[in-house]
């Protein structure tokens, strides 16, 4: 995972690179991890039901070093992420 201020380059299992925009990041004290919500550049984030949103745990890079995306490992993690997502969507609806 390479990233700038608001973008990351995600490399899939086939070695294909895709530039993605970071929607938001957060940390979970319960799981001791950082998480990032992101979507492909070019997809407009106006309707979250129509935009493919990805989420991964991540280890930030230090200095010039690249960070690393990690898979979500448990059902409990997914439940926590879903709560964070629902809160984010509710806040967006209020704006």
Swiss-Prot record:
InterPro entries: UPF0473 (IPR009711). Coiled coil: none annotated. Belongs to the UPF0473 family. This is UPF0473 protein GWCH70_2487. It comes from Geobacillus sp. (strain WCH70).
């Amino acid at each position: 995972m390479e990233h700038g201020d608001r973008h990351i380059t995600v490399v899939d299992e086939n070695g294909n690179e895709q530039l993605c925009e970071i929607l938001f990041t957060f940390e979970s004290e319960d799981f001791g991890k950082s998480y990032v919500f992101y979507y492909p550049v070019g997809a407009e984030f106006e309707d979250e039901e129509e935009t493919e949103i990805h989420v991964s745990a991540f280890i930030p890079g230090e200095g010039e070093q690249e960070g690393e995306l990690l898979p979500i490992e448990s059902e409990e993690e997914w439940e926590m992420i879903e709560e964070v997502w629902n809160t984010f969507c509710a806040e967006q609806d209020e704006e």
